[in-house]
Amino acid sequence: MKELYLIDALNIIFRNYHVMKNYPLLNTQGENVNAFIGFFKTLFFIIKEKNPEHLIITFDSEVPTFRKQKYPSYKATRDLPPDDLIPQIGWIKEGLLKAKIPIFEMEGYEADDLLASFAKKAAKNNYLTYIISPDKDLLQTMSEYVKILKIENNSFIEMDNEYVTKKFGVNSFQIKDYLAIVGDRSDNIPGIKGIGAKGAANLLREFKTLDGIYSNLEIINKKHRELLIKEKENAFLSYELVSLEENLKIPEIENFALKNFSEEIISLFEKHSAIALIKTYKKDILKQEKENADQKSLFKQEPTTNSLDDINTIDTENVKYRSITTKIELDDLIESLKKAKYISIDTETSSLDTYTAKLIGISISFKEFEGYYIPIEAKGKIYIEKNYIIQKFNNLFESNPKIIGQNYKFDYKILKNNGFNPIPPYFDTMIAAYLIDTNSKVSLDFLAEKYLMHKNIKYEDVIQKNDNFANISLEMATSYSSEDADITFRLFNIFTKKLKEDKLDKLMHEIEMPFNKVIIEMEENGIYLDKEYLKEYGKELGKELEAIENEIIKSIGIDFNLNSPKQMHEILFEKLNLKLPEKMKKDSTDIKVLESLREQHESIENLIKYRQIAKLKSTYTDNLIELINYKTNRLHTSFIQTKTATGRITSINPNLQNIPIKDEKGRKIRKAFKPENGNIFISADYSQIELAILAHLSQDEVLIKAFENNKDIHTETASKLFKIEEKEITPNLRRIAKSINFGIIYRMSDFRLAKELGITKEEAKGFINSYFDSYPKIKEFIINQINFVRNAGYSETILKRRRYIKEINSNNYLERSAAERIAINSIIQGSAADIMKIAMVKVFNEFKSKKMESKILLQVHDEMLIESPIEEENEVKKILKIMMETAYTLNLPLRANIETGKSWGEIH
């Protein structure tokens, strides 16, 4: 029997648009292509898996349908398609026409009507029809010759009568009657109000059809009878609306044979940066001949008695993954790697702790769709001695190959701590993905699906809970690990082109990858922590907490657990009967809630103080000691290069960037961080770098002159705002000016500024206006920057780092305002981050070139912390001053402040 496949285009389009809505794929013009790429990915999957002889892709009519004419409220509650989706529908139609893939639409009818009519006509002509859509309306077309399929997790699920009965409680032939009763909220079909899914199923089980129900009203229970009588008109109207038109005048099925695909669509894929689609189209759709020469050895060499056995090769239609289990095979592989232009490396380990993890295996790829796995251990079996593998890889690393990795920082440390001498990566796909879209996820699984339309083998599908990678079969280990290396290599090729298209390749290779080398070493350096000092300070905080707790209990008159949110809630809102301000979470007792209650009871101030001290104690004095590495006796944080949208790095496990500095308690915690072996800490930070960048970008002569004259910018601003001499500026006036200076960077509203300064909204508005009068070009810069982002869709730092801000054109005022704040902040904070990275790379390289023992330990926003031998102190200060102040040329001087101390707490 001949087969026909019918596809509901808009269903696939909308589904793909929304599934990636928060992580949009963008072409080189900054346009969203989620739906475009997702649609063709799905279509090519269908064609590859089903190989249909006849296929029709249907679209809704662009003019109102007969249902809209009959019932004007039909689909009236639906939102209009998003602005960035509408053009994608046009591109999809254009692509289908270019590829010569049959499409069909008819004025006045929906795609579902076309599908129903084609299905009926096909059945009459002895076709077996498959409709691919999850739409429940189409279930009414089901028959012996018409099957309904939906796609889930890369597989086809038939929605047969058993499926319908289980999901809706009725048979497929009753779907129209069922929908007439329950209605359809998405289409605004009324149905019978008051009768739900369960009631509808029960009625149809007994009376079979809608007509059958109305013919037996006298024996139906009173409640349902009254509803049925009241809603009769809506019931039969709904029946008409859900009934699909099966008798439209449509062309013959033979006109829709799927053949003679055209390559014209490839130019459209190139235009919209759909590189993976081009490969899929050529390989799976055009059915080009694939290279299938019989390889006589692992690397197309002459056959030898030591070539890899077939049993160690995993061949599928698309990939070739192999395990390396003999010394000869490893020698062969290493020699080939020495000739390779790029090498992707991934490691498998016993844990994620890079200091204690055992290396289980290494995977390699240097050609797309190929991968090689070298097991250190598999199922308790040792194939090649570890020392031999180390020797061979160290020999490879000496040739300085270009290493590719996905978060290779982890693999580098694993290799190093397992006896290898690895070299830093040439390219990291995680960093590249982050640069291409700072708002996107960057995990390998996500990137594979996003850019390659490929679902990776899941780790949890390979490793059982609490099991170890060393315990799985060699075949499974080879498949899983080789795939990671292969996917990373494929992503590298895509990202290399994408970075060049987006003009991000310079940022990648001249800043981010050299900086990656710096943070690898920073993580290895770690920082010494005085455990005894921290323990004693923890005891001191504990005593202070106990005293505050006693005061609170005495004030309230009830003994309760201050660390129990439930008990705290009962005390505050039931015992003390405090009133929670509007818009506050009713069940919350977090710090914001407590601050809002400050004026209502004398104990609230102490509760806030208790919370703050308890957090310091649990986060730092209690926790940091537990994180000290027993091998190095130092604390090793992890720096994340791909987290913030502005380009700043973050510190985790533990977060050393959030230790308070403005209060005495935070400074005391910092005092626990000390140099070792008689060394000294040297700190360097930029003086007002964000305001310096604002002056540079805005070209405001007044602000530039203030920097050139090395003036205190906040005092200068206060003088202009309050129109008094600088010598008359009080600390409070300077504080106001400082808030306004940074408020401008963060696009602070007059309302928020008023709240921060404790003044009226009118006064705050006056300060902002006065500020722009004093620095006129700053206002002009802000307006121009927002307009640039509106047109381009992204902000851009001075070094071309992009941040896509789609909400900048939102119709929602709050969304748009937030996007405007992000637009200004991103260019300033992002540019500061860029300059700091350049400076750190220069300092790092200078230390290396001079073979100095000094090392960079931490970076906290605009500050760099160095541990240095006393004898190198002056040289380090000189290097920091020169390298930081010449990192990037602005239209005004960059200035670095240098301080020293015997602990981190002594600095600042």
Swiss-Prot record:
Its EC number is 2.7.7.7. Residues 532-908 are annotated as: Polymerase. One of its GO terms (biological process) is double-strand break repair. The keyword Repeat does not apply. Residues 1-318 form the 5'-3' exonuclease domain. Disulfide bonds: none annotated. InterPro entries: 3'-5'_exonuclease_dom (IPR002562), 5-3_exonucl_a-hlix_arch_N (IPR020046), 5-3_exonuclease (IPR002421), 5-3_exonuclease_C_sf (IPR036279), DNA-dir_DNA_pol_A_CS (IPR019760), DNA-dir_DNA_pol_A_palm_dom (IPR001098), DNA/RNA_pol_sf (IPR043502), DNA_polI_H3TH (IPR020045). Residues 319-531 form the 3'-5' exonuclease domain. It comes from the Bacteria. In addition to polymerase activity, this DNA polymerase exhibits 3'-5' and 5'-3' exonuclease activity. The gene is polA. Belongs to the DNA polymerase type-A family. Transmembrane segments: none annotated. This is DNA polymerase I. It comes from Borreliella burgdorferi (strain ATCC 35210 / DSM 4680 / CIP 102532 / B31) (Borrelia burgdorferi). PROSITE patterns: DNA_POLYMERASE_A. Keywords: DNA damage, DNA repair, DNA replication, DNA-binding, DNA-directed DNA polymerase, Exonuclease, Hydrolase, Nuclease, Nucleotidyltransferase, Transferase. Gene3D superfamilies: 3.30.70.370, 5' to 3' exonuclease, C-terminal subdomain (1.10.150.20), 5'-nuclease (3.40.50.1010), Ribonuclease H-like superfamily/Ribonuclease H (3.30.420.10), Taq DNA Polymerase, Chain T, domain 4 (1.20.1060.10). GO terms for molecular function: 3'-5' exonuclease activity; 5'-3' exonuclease activity; DNA binding; DNA-directed DNA polymerase activity. It catalyses: DNA(n) + a 2'-deoxyribonucleoside 5'-triphosphate = DNA(n+1) + diphosphate.
